[in-house]
A protein has these predicted regions:
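Short acidic, hydrophobic short linear motifs in intrinsically disordered regions
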Residues: 29-39
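Short helix-coil junctions and helix-kink-helix linkers
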Residues: 37-47
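Short alpha-helical segments that sit at the start of domains
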Residues: 1-29
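Amphipathic alpha-helical dimerization/coiled-coil segments
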Residues: 88-125
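Key DNA-contact positions within bacterial/archaeal DNA-binding proteins
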Residues: 50
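A short, conserved structural fragment
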Residues: 60-70
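Short, hydrophobic-biased segments on the C-terminal half of alpha helices
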Residues: 53-57
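Short, cationic-aromatic polyanion-contact patches
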Residues: 70-89
Length: 125
């Protein structure tokens, strides 16, 4: 698993992904309260600050975020860009499901999309 500096990129849980996606969608340094508010609004959650704080701490530990402390105020800065994570997840998906063959993946994806698009369509004579 190669990342930006040759380090291992850790997997995100579903909850961590929601918090991280919220931060990626607002690419500026954010405080806990804003992250909590936007995550709850976006994903229909009712997470309290302690819950979101726990997820953020895990994201910092996994190397996705950096905490910047100024007195009692902390903001969080993105370290791993969204595109880097998407590329890594896509690479792992193709490697696992299609033995690393992008062509095989695209063929399967095209067939599924084409079949789904043609369901219920009657041929006209």
């Amino acid at each position: 698993m190669l990342t930006m500096k040759g380090e291992n990129m850790e997997e995100l849980t579903t909850a961590e992904s929601m918090v991280m996606k919220t931060i990626w969608d607002h690419p500026y340094e954010m405080a806990l309260q804003e992250i909590m508010k936007l995550t709850n609004e976006t994903y229909g959650k009712d997470w309290k600050s302690q819950t979101v704080s726990t997820y953020i701490a895990k994201l910092v530990k996994k190397g996705f975020l950096r905490m910047n402390q100024s007195g009692r105020n902390a903001t969080y800065e993105i370290i791993i860009p969204e595109l880097s994570y998407q590329q890594e997840q896509s690479r792992k998906f193709v490697k696992f499901w299609n033995r690393g063959s992008v062509a095989q993946f695209l063929t399967a994806f095209y067939k599924e999309t084409y079949q789904r698009g043609n369901r219920g369509v009657e041929k006209k004579h």
